[in-house]
């Protein structure tokens, strides 16, 4: 019987096939391992950063976790987010809405948090309680552990670092809230060179909100922040401004109108109406009925 002769080409092809199979299996395992590691890393990173807690068109419930009285009729309310790493993801200068049902009707009121949008785990609202204020009384009656319904973000103003060389801010009462948020963002960012000038109007000295925090920022950043308090009813020995915010005060203490300046207003309607007229008399653009980003004069 003749001996079968092995074909070298067949042997080579067989060996090559085996080698290719091993190489393919090796790289498949490495790829799977890399993918798993990447997925785990991505998941860990996402968990670490947390998630935005707000939904623009849907009210969600957030628990009240603390209440700090800052004047006879105003308090800072701290609300918890679902997870310790969650954030509001609220652009600087925008606001949220609190809603509830009163006498069968939905009532909604907007507030700007004084905490920044990237604050993790909670957010703070500065709210003044008015006798006829449905939402302010609704919140004031809440106890720690109770929930409020909130949605957002909303608003037409978004602050970005160095968007203008200077900002003139005029605030009355709790109208300081969006101004404080903007000031905090600027002063906490060493890359932001914006100069800020604030005229803050109140009735009495006890009505001044966030005074210590504002003056601490001014002390730490004297070249970037100037604060001018104005009181209708000034006590004896008051070292700041008295009366009402007038065109003369605006002209003296705030930046002049220019392409590199924004004038931001927030306060009671009568005050805002007077400030818009004063701004026009000083050469600023006329404020529009609804302010939009890019307007020289913006009303919150």
Curated annotation (Swiss-Prot):
Coiled coil: none
Co-factor requirement: FAD
Catalytic activity as recorded in UniProt: 2 Fe(III)-[cytochrome b5] + NADH = 2 Fe(II)-[cytochrome b5] + NAD(+) + H(+); 2 Fe(3+)-[Dph3] + NADH = 2 Fe(2+)-[Dph3] + NAD(+) + H(+)
Start and end residues of each FAD-binding FR-type domain: 57-160
Low complexity composition bias: residue spans: 34-45
One MF annotation (Gene Ontology) recorded for this entry: cytochrome-b5 reductase activity, acting on NAD(P)H
Superkingdom, natural source: Eukaryota
Gene Ontology cellular component terms for the protein in this record: endoplasmic reticulum; mitochondrial outer membrane; plasma membrane
EC number: 1.6.2.2
Annotated positions binding FAD: 140-155, 166-198
Pathway: Protein modification; peptidyl-diphthamide biosynthesis
Pfam families: FAD_binding_6, NAD_binding_1
Broad class of enzyme this protein falls into: oxidoreductase
Disordered: region residues: 34-54
InterPro entries: CBR-like, Cbr1-like_FAD-bd_dom, FAD-bd_FR_type, Flavoprot_Pyr_Nucl_cyt_Rdtase, FNR_nucleotide-bd, OxRdtase_FAD/NAD-bd, Riboflavin_synthase-like_b-brl
Entry's localization field: Mitochondrion outer membrane
Any single biological process term in GO: tRNA wobble base 5-methoxycarbonylmethyl-2-thiouridinylation
The keyword Magnesium appears for this protein: no
General function of this protein: NADH-dependent reductase for DPH3 and cytochrome b5. Required for the first step of diphthamide biosynthesis, a post-translational modification of histidine which occurs in elongation factor 2. DPH1 and DPH2 transfer a 3-amino-3-carboxypropyl (ACP) group from S-adenosyl-L-methionine (SAM) to a histidine residue, the reaction is assisted by a reduction system comprising DPH3 and a NADH-dependent reductase, predominantly CBR1. By reducing DPH3, also involved in the formation of the tRNA wobble base modification mcm5s 2U (5-methoxycarbonylmethyl-2-thiouridine), mediated by the elongator complex.
Similarity section: Belongs to the flavoprotein pyridine nucleotide cytochrome reductase family.
Protein name, entry field: NADH-cytochrome b5 reductase 1
Annotated source species: Lodderomyces elongisporus (strain ATCC 11503 / CBS 2605 / JCM 1781 / NBRC 1676 / NRRL YB-4239)
Gene: CBR1
